[in-house]
Regions:
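Alpha-helical substrate-recognition element adjacent to the catalytic core
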Residues: 1-77, 81-85
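C-terminal cap/substrate-recognition subdomain and adjoining C-terminal extension
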Residues: 39, 52-133
Length: 133
C-alpha cells in the first residue's frame, strides 16, 4: 500500500518553520508500516515552499536516531488528503496519514493552544484492526 505521510502535525508537532517535537508513537508506527512492506511517501506543504524546509523534514525523518527505513520520495506539491477511511484505503491501496484528513483521530498539540495532531496510538489500533499493520 502507498501511504502518503504528512509531516507537521502528523510526525511532529506544529512548529513550522521549525521542526516540532516528535509526535508520540509516530516513529514506532511508521517503522512498523515500513517493515510490513508499505511504501511511505512524504506529502507535506513544505514541498510547496522553496525554503529548504522539505529537505530539513527529509533529513529529520532519515536521521539514524529515528530508526526508520529511508524515506526518499515526496510529492512535488501537497496532495490534499482523502479521508482516513481504512476500507477505502484497502480498496484503492493508498492511505493518507495527515492531521487534516477527515476522520483521522487527533490529540491536542502540546505546543499550540487549540491545535491538534495525529493520535498515533489510536491510528495504530485502527491499522491493526484493518489488517494493514
Amino acid at each position: 500500500m502507498i501511504i502518503y505521510l504528512d509531516f507537521d502535525g502528523t510526525v511532529v508537532e506544529h512548529q513550522y518553520p521549525a521542526i516540532g517535537a516528535e509526535n508520540p508513537h509516530a516513529f514506532r508506527v511508521i517503522r512498523a508500516l515500513q517493515v510490513k512492506g508499505h511504501h511511505i511517501i512524504l506529502n507535506t506543504y513544505r514541498a510547496d515552499i522553496n525554503d529548504g524546509s522539505l529537505a530539513e523534514a527529509l533529513d529529520y525523518l532519515n536521521s539514524p536516531t529515528n530508526g526508520l527505513l529511508p524515506i526518499t520520495e515526496h510529492t512535488a506539491r501537497k496532495i490534499h488528503p482523502g479521508p482516513f477511511d481504512l476500507t477505502e484505503s484497502l480498496r484503492f491501496e493508498k492511505l493518507y496519514i495527515d492531521d487534516i484528513a477527515e476522520e483521522i483521530p487527533l490529540i491536542p498539540n502540546r505546543m499550540i493552544a487549540n491545535g491538534f495532531m495525529v493520535d498515533w496510538a489510536t491510528v495504530e489500533h485502527a491499522l491493526i484492526q484493518a489488517d494493514i499493520l
